[in-house]
Amino acid sequence: LFGCFHSPWDDRVEQVVKACRLSTKSIYGELWANGMDIKDLPKMLDAGITNTVKLLLTNDRKKMKKKYLMQNYRFFLAVMKSSFDSNDHQTAMMLYMALTHMSVEGLDFKRPKKAQGKLDTVGKTYGSVESCYNKHVTEMLRENVNDYLPSLIACSMYVNKHDAYAKAFKNMGH
């Protein structure tokens, strides 16, 4: 019955979710291979968020119209929700931070009706920068490690000693 409502857009979302999940696993693999040396991790995570914001706000170097901005927003929102539902929390948190970035929040365009609800669900599940995403870290400790990919963004806040990461994200508009 639900097959008649399936579209190429759904296939694209699924493809991107799978690719992002592989990327998350690659980041974990690289950390493991480097003996958990995380000195470059904050730069990599910041670059991921910044590049996602750039992708959201661009249309193949052409002038961005609201129509394309809305399409990009809707697409990344769907990828975030699907990643969240499939326990790829690195991707979900990165997209959440991109979608709620001040560069995106400040733009005047119509968001999808259910966008705020999806963002609120993710935000409430993870906690805030001010709480160092303690809800996510607490949840991570209780989950099955085989299927659950925790967010390195949240985890790295507990590794950095002087809350430099929290300060940087606040300065970036979060």
Task: Label each region the model flagged.
Residues L1-H174:
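Eukaryotic small-GTPase/lipid signaling interfaces
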